Amino acid sequence: MTRNQIHSIFLSALVLVAALIATRPAAAQDPKQPYPTMAPVEQYLMDHDAEIALARSAAPDAISHDASVIVLTRHGYETAVEGKNGWVCWVGRGWMAMFDHPEFWNPKVRAADCLNPPAARSVLPYAYKRTELLLAGHSKPEVIAAIKAAIDKKELPPLEPGAVDYMMSKGSYLTDSGNHNGPHLMFYQTAKDGAAWGANLTNSPILAVNYWYISAEAYPQLESFPPLSVFLIGVDKWSDGTPAPSM
């Protein structure tokens, strides 16, 4: 798998999440982008049981077996299974990528995630809010404004230390690029960039990207959001323990 393919996978994973760092700086303004608007909501929905199974496959069974599971409905995410260990597994859609991601509205994206307790408490609320607003028909600028207002009013939590996201499902579809998938872990940090982690450097195994945008040019208000970076480290196994293509 090439580094560019890894970058594209990272972008589509978030649910966030992304690494087109230097390859598509003007993607949001590209008139040829393949998914300019939201598809009919039916195209984003899944069979209930299939979605639960895919969500659980994001992490090894030792983690996901006792995790809560949420599934997408026409109005947002709802709890399908109450867990015991504080983890939450779910299947993110394309709109959990950065707001200017070219595959933001890609209805094929199915990004299985399992969030540890700190991420479930402090990252997932943003996914709930974003999804609810988009499914209600709000535009991206309206969603951005609503999220900023919720942050300012402390209706959305600050990031907790130690927030981690497992994305090791063999069944995920993260992007139209490359082989569409790749197992990895993601770490959330209140950092403006990846310099302190040595991310995005030649031969570094760590990739990093801004959580909110590729380039703030399309949505300048995002520059006023709290700094949040996502760090990705590829792994060599799927969640079931079988070998995966090298990242």
Regions found by a protein language model. Give the residues of each.
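Bacterial N-terminal signal peptides
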Residues: 12-21
